[in-house]
Amino acid sequence: MSCGRPPPDVDGMITLKVDNLTYRTSPDSLRRVFEKYGRVGDVYIPREPHTKAPRGFAFVRFHDRRDAQDAEAAMDGAELDGRELRVQVARYGRRDLPRSRQGEPRGRSRGGGYGRRSRSYGRRSRSPRRRHRSRSRGPSCSRSRSRSRYRGSRYSRSPYSRSPYSRSRYSRSPYSRSRYRESRYGGSHYSSSGYSNSRYSRYHSSRSHSKSGSSTSSRSASTSKSSSARRSKSSSVSRSRSRSRSSSMTRSPPRVSKRKSKSRSRSKRPPKSPEEEGQMSS
C-alpha cells in the first residue's frame, strides 16, 4: 500500500504501531519484513502535510490477531535501517468519519483510524498550554497583590511618603528623611543601651560641624576679600589725591599773604628820631 492515500477498508484488522523509523524506510520494506509472520492487510507511513516528509512512525495491519501478536514479539527491539524499532499494539480503534470526508487523506490513530491521532494530540497539547498560562498568570497576580500589601498596609500609612524608610513604621512625619536616622539610631529604642552617643551620632555631628565650618570659612574669606578690596581702593584714592596736590604745588608759585607783606613793610621803615617822637607826642 502506498503512503500517500488511506486504505479502502481497515475494519476488523489488528493494527501495530512501529516507532523510531528513519526517513529512508519505505512501506514496501516494512511489508517485506512483517509478511514473515502473517498476512499483512495494509502498511501506512504518515507524512507532514506541508513538507511531505515522513513523521518517523508507521502502522502495519494484520488480518489475524495471532499473526499481529507474533510480529509484535519478534520485531519489538529489532533493527531496521540502523534504528531499533519499537512495536506495540494500537489501543484505540478507528473513529467514524462523515461521508463527505471519507475520501480525504488524514493521519491515522493508534487503533487503525485516520485522523484521530492528530486531533487527540492537538487537544492534549492545547490543554497543558492553557494550564501553563493560567499558572503563569497566577504568580504574577499574587506578586502584584503582595507588593501592594507590602507597600500599603505595612509601611505607607501616610499618603505622601514614597520611600519605605520615611514611613509610619520608622518616622512619624511623612516628609522628614533625616528623622529616620534620628529615630533609628538616637531614639528611645537605643537610648537605654547607649547607642545615642555611638558612631552614627558622631558621624552626623561631625558632618554638620564640617558643613557649618565650611560655610563660616567661606563667609570670612568673602568678607576679607571685600575689606582688602576696599582698602586697596582707599589707598589708590589717597595716592591720587597726594599726587594731584604735589603737582599743583610745583606748578603754582607760593602766594604771600597781604598781612605778611604789610608787617614786612612796617618793619623795613627806619627808626624815628627823638625829635619826631616829641612832635608826635605834642
UniProtKB/Swiss-Prot annotation:
Q: Where is the composition biased (Low complexity)?
A: 155-177, 185-200, 211-227, 234-255
Would the keyword Transcription be found if you checked this record's keyword annotation? no
Q: Where in this protein does the record say Phosphoserine is found?
A: 2, 26, 156, 158, 171, 173, 196, 273
Tell me the tissue specificity.
Answer: Strongly expressed in pancreas, spleen and prostate. Weakly expressed in lung, liver and thymus.
Identify the keywords attached in UniProt to this record, alphabetized: Acetylation, mRNA processing, mRNA splicing, Nucleus, Phosphoprotein, RNA-binding
The UniProt regions of compositional bias labelled Basic residues, in chain numbering, are 116-136, 144-154, 201-210, 256-271
Q: Which GO cellular component terms, listed alphabetically, does the Swiss-Prot or TrEMBL entry include?
A: cytosol; nuclear speck; nucleoplasm
GO BP terms in the entry:
mRNA processing; regulation of alternative mRNA splicing, via spliceosome; RNA splicing
What SMART domains does the record tag this protein with?
RRM
UniProt-annotated location(s): Nucleus
Instruction: Indicate where the modification N-acetylserine is found in the sequence.
Output: 2
Q: Give the GO molecular function terms.
A: RNA binding
Q: By its UniProt entry, which Gene3D superfamilies does this protein fall under?
A: 3.30.70.330
Region of interest (Disordered), residue spans: 91-282
- Indicate, by first and last residue, each region the UniProt record lists as having compositional bias (Basic and acidic residues): 93-107
Residue span(s) of domain RRM:
14-92
Q: Which family does it belong to?
A: Belongs to the splicing factor SR family.
Q: Any idea what job this protein has? A: Involved in pre-mRNA alternative splicing.
Q: Which PANTHER family match?
A: TRANSFORMER-2 SEX-DETERMINING PROTEIN-RELATED
Record protein name field: Serine/arginine-rich splicing factor 8
Q: Which organism is it from?
A: Homo sapiens
As recorded in Swiss-Prot or TrEMBL, the protein's gene is named SRSF8
